[in-house]
């Protein structure tokens, strides 16, 4: 019997939010939808290199790769009290959204880590992406994804 080498997008999202970043604290928040989109996109590209299927389709957009399905899942998980979105106003950045798991989300992520065989293979990769990019300046992160994957940058017509 051949093992299925795929993971659901929503599970990837939970694991990304659960993972520590540079702070080494579990459930380190991800600041901004753009950052969340880019980190998940980069994770999926690394999974693709390992032959693991993923579920979020990304399309070209102004700020690079964008997934409507990811936005939909975030809204659903907020509604289900799995993800908490805190909206803060910054003098320098305008309105900013901060994403992290709720207690319910932490339980679900922990269950994934103990009950999903493929997670043991991919979780170290997820932690590495979060550690590397979660505190990177957002402009630099967008430029990085533009440079690495120019096919995901929407061409502005004018």
Language-model segments: residues:
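Domain-edge interaction signal
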Residues: 1-158
């Amino acid at each position: 019997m051949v093992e299925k080498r795929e993971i659901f997008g929503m599970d990837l999202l939970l694991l990304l939010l659960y993972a520590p970043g540079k702070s080494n604290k579990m459930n380190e928040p991800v600041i901004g939808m753009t950052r969340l989109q880019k980190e998940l996109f980069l994770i999926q590209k690394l999974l693709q290199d390992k032959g693991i299927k993923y579920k979020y389709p990304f399309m070209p957009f102004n700020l690079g790769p964008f997934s409507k399905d990811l936005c939909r899942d975030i809204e659903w998980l907020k509604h289900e009290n799995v993800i908490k979105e805190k909206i803060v106003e910054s003098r320098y950045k305008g309105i900013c959204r901060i994403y992290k798991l709720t207690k319910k989300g932490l339980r679900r992520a922990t269950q994934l880590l103990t009950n999903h065989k493929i997670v043991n293979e991919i979780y170290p990769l997820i932690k590495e992406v979060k550690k590397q990019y979660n505190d990177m300046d957002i402009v630099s992160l967008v430029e990085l994804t533009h440079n690495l994957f120019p096919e995901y940058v929407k061409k502005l017509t004018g």
